Amino acid sequence: MLVSYNWLKDFLDLDEDPKDLGEKITRTGVEIASVDHPAEGLKKIVVGHILECEDIEGTHLHKCQVDVGEEEPIQIVCGAPNVAAGEDVIVALHGARIAGNEKIKRGKIRGIKSNGMICGLQEIGFEDKVVPAKYADGIFVFPKDADVKPGEEVYKALGMDDYILDFDITPNRADTLSMEGAAYEVGAIVDEKPKVEPVVLKEDGPDWTNELDVQVDEKLAPKFYLRKISNVKIGESPLWMQRRLWNAGIRPINNVVDVTNYVMLLTGQPMHAYDARTFKDGKLEVRKANKNEKLTLLNDKEVELDPNDIIITDGQKPVMMAGVMGGKNSEVEDDTTDVILESAVFDGTSVRKSALRHANRTEASSRFEKGVNWDNTQKALDMAALLLRNDADGTVNEGEIKATDAQRNPSVVKTTVSYINKVLGTELSRAEMEKIFDQLGFTVAGSEDELVVTIPNRRWDISIPADLVEEVGRIYGYDNLKSTQPLLAETHGGYSAKETAMRRIKDIVQGQGLMEAISYSLTSPEKAISFTKDPKPVVEVQWPLNSSRSTMRENLITGLVDAASYNMARKQKELALFEQGRVYDHENNTFNEHEHLAALYSGHTLAANWQHLDQKIDFYFVKGQLTNLFRAIGIKDEDVEYRAELVQGMHPTRTAGIYINDQYIGLIGMLAHAVTTLDKALRGSEIYVYEIDLDTIVSMLHKGMKAKAAPKFPAIERDLSLLVPNDVTNAQIEAQIKLNGGKYLYDIRVIDVYAGSQIESGHKSISYSLTFLNEKDTLTDEVVATAMEKIEADLKESLKIKVR
């Protein structure tokens, strides 16, 4: 929002340097991005009155005699198509500085002396977007009613003597998107009540309210007011209004459109003016668009309307995209005589989505989406009507149509003096706080410690006690808050047992060569429950940034897969990533957080070189990494079991659930081909992951691995070759071997797996190496032989395995 310092002075008695004021406003919470002085760097630019204008034969040039307030007129050669005798124009004299620090000198053009330059607005620093269309390709001509004299500087007449404060407004401070709102804000800072005058409107035309049948859905437009102004004369706006518009970054159009923009800047209430001929059938309807309806907007852009767009129609066809922009078919034109003014409150969410959907964000839509002051609907309508009567010779017809007129009660927030002082660390009295609230335009009730504060409707951002704390703090002055040491209970320092365990796990994983990734906690609803054995109700965000960040994650693998995609798209194929973080669910109607650890592997364990071939990462490599982690934190191998699982997003035959003492703590496996195929960057890659619930296993952690003395007695090894049915797993076999191997069974290792044409159909060959050890005495062959016989017999009976 570009705020004119001179316009602010209509509301407040300001004598402070504009740049100092900008600094003061910034310190209270509304950032002033810049303070610009349009006349800065310009000199010797004056009003000139063209006395004579002759065409120079054979050229597009004109030789002009111009009165610039000196004893004699000066001669200037000008090539603008709209230069003519009798006009008041902008003249840069000899030695003048114009935009771009360009210096103007006397010279000759086509051999004819020229003692200066007749300027267009762009040449003295105006942006193209604010220059009126009629002057875009020529010089600027002062309106006939402009109070200017030859020889006086142009800066005041054009509003260039002003200072423009650029309010960098956050979405919660929509109240400052108007001059009145800015005046309330600045007034609170300088402790002065702004002079905001009521509108007194006289109706001098016949009643018109029976001319139009208006149908409005209150959900789409809770307030919808109309007035009719007859016999308007379309023309140029007075110069005072034009300069206020272009200093706010808005191009003057004509006296009707300019009034609607001016009132929007003044009150924050977007307005629209229709040519009354648009509604010749006497109908106006506010509704949702129908499928395949189209509308050509005022910017000549044709849009295909969405069924969620709010539109205004003439009873049949659309004439405006509500809250965004009017239609070309209802535009006020040069021959317009009767105008219908609209002042309304539209559903802000719908307006925002329409503006975004059609890539057409406007000054009006930005105000509706942030929230307008419902109390200004009537004032804005009457102000626009008053200005059209004064500046366009219009007749204000009696009556207004209030198709919808919902009311919004001011919010009331309760707090206490002691609470505000406690949060701010101040010792302000009740009287001091009441004074601050009065400066802000809030009313206060209550007694003693209690504060009952009524918030005006222009302030949408105040709803809870913490908001009142902020208001008191910023108006009192953050610079005035005393610096104090925080009061904390004494502790012995150090990490808690859980923090220590979590850090230890992270250190171990990093020691395995993995790099830490940090991903978003927010994801899409679909991704939130992927890679999860038993998805729980998700935690949804009420006001998401977009649909892909609307849900709190239930797993960490999703974020690692996104990180892998990002890296692989940039030719980084060898990946070993991990993330330790929280996941969320809404089970049993409570919001729950769990600490998880996840890892992702892709590529090779070692790159190929002259010493060895490369080896691709597979399930067993990742399982080995996880086994080493469990051992390092004191979880025994025999307590861990891997069971085949079907999990969404995971490979159906290369995925296992991880169980510790029969309790599920996570999963391990390969991403499903369906997942990697959908992402171009991941296509063709084999990606392995695991994820474990750290909260579940933290109670199982010990201080670390315990060292054992080397055995004093020799071990005995025996090989065991088995013909195994395909549906029997290694885990089942090892469990039976451990069950029957006796107390001296020390270790089991798989040494070979084979499945081929030489093996019986439906079977596979697995060979094991079993190690037996008596740590207190020499182990005999007889003891080992007995154990082997028992193992073989049990495998044959329980799992239908043949010993080869």
UniProtKB/Swiss-Prot annotation:
Residues 711-804 form the FDX-ACB domain. Residues 39-155 form the tRNA-binding domain. Binds 2 magnesium ions per tetramer. Its cofactor is Mg(2+). Pfam families: B3_4, B5, FDX-ACB, tRNA_bind, tRNA_synthFbeta. It is found in: Cytoplasm. The keyword tRNA-binding applies. Its EC number is 6.1.1.20. Its main location: cytoplasm. Keywords: Aminoacyl-tRNA synthetase, ATP-binding, Cytoplasm, Ligase, Magnesium, Metal-binding, Nucleotide-binding, Protein biosynthesis, RNA-binding, tRNA-binding. It comes from the Bacteria. GO terms for biological process: phenylalanyl-tRNA aminoacylation. One of its GO terms (cellular component) is phenylalanine-tRNA ligase complex. HAMAP family: Phe_tRNA_synth_beta1. Tetramer of two alpha and two beta subunits. Belongs to the phenylalanyl-tRNA synthetase beta subunit family. Type 1 subfamily. This is Phenylalanine--tRNA ligase beta subunit. It comes from Lactobacillus johnsonii (strain CNCM I-12250 / La1 / NCC 533). The lineage of its organism: Bacteria, Bacillati, Bacillota, Bacilli, Lactobacillales. The gene is pheT.
